[in-house]
């Protein structure tokens, strides 16, 4: 009995609700009765507005928007060329060619043997001759003979044979230079020690006795085969 009363009251409420509405929902939610919707911006503007850019900032071209974040953006010239905004007739190479285009090759520098000046050419000829050209030139200074004579010494030339003979011939100019230096030292010794040079064979000083002893031992004949005087043998300036 209690359950039947509840069911009857529920049915009564539903009937009253249907009578109170009576077609009002159809009139209220019809197509003309929709509230005005807000203007939806394009998708590009929506994506740009989500970035932390200040309001009113210029929106970049579509090419820049299509590049993923962190990717290298091509130069503006390539972007304009891809959008066909470049003036006609102007050739722009592809991006790969721009990246891998080698730098212009500079003209090679002039080498020393290719220089127009004549000084380097003469120097190159002297170097190409080798040590033979240097040995053929006689040493500078007064020419002194093998035993101190004033006769000019014959120039020494390097023989064509190889081995020990070539080495000895190459050392002859150095021996001539040593001979010239020895003569200069002897002259300097005579100027510095005139007393020793003027001492005779019968003096009683220590210098005279030393000269007699050296004369007996024949020390004055042994400096590169050249004869030495008393000044050189006593003072050691001869060799």
From Swiss-Prot:
Comp. bias regions, Basic and acidic residues: 173-183
Protein location: Secreted
Organism listed in the record: Lachesis muta muta
Name of the protein in question: Bradykinin-potentiating and C-type natriuretic peptides
Any one annotated GO CC term: extracellular region
Stored InterPro entries: Natr_peptide, Natr_peptide_CS
GO molecular function: hormone activity; peptidase inhibitor activity; toxin activity
Pyrrolidone carboxylic acid found at: 50, 65, 83, 98
Family note: In the N-terminal section; belongs to the bradykinin-potentiating peptide family. In the central section; belongs to the bradykinin inhibitor peptide family.
Bias (Low complexity): 161-171
């Amino acid at each position: 009995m209690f359950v039947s009363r509840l069911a009857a009251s529920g049915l009564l409420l539903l009937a009253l609700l249907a009578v109170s509405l009576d077609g009002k929902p159809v009139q209220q939610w019809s197509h003309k009765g929709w509230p005005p919707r807000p203007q939806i911006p394009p998708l590009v503007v929506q994506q740009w507005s989500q970035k932390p850019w200040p309001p009113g900032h210029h929106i970049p071209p579509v090419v820049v928007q299509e590049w993923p974040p962190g990717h290298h953006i091509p130069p503006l010239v390539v972007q304009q060329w891809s959008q066909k905004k470049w003036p006609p007739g102007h050739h722009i190479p592809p991006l790969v060619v721009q990246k891998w285009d080698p730098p212009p090759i500079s003209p090679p520098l002039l080498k020393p043997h290719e220089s127009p000046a004549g000084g380097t050419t003469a120097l190159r000829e002297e170097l190409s001759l080798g040590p033979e050209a240097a040995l053929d030139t006689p040493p500078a200074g007064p020419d002194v003979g093998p035993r101190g004579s004033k006769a000019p010494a014959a120039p020494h030339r390097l023989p064509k044979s190889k081995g020990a003979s070539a080495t000895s011939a190459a050392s002859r100019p150095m021996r001539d230079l040593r001979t010239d230096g020895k003569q200069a030292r002897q002259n300097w010794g005579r100027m510095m020690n005139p007393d020793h040079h003027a001492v005779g064979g019968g003096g009683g000083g220590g210098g005279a006795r030393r000269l007699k002893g050296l004369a007996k031992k024949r020390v004055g004949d042994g400096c590169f085969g050249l004869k030495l005087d008393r000044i050189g043998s006593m003072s050691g300036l001869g060799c």
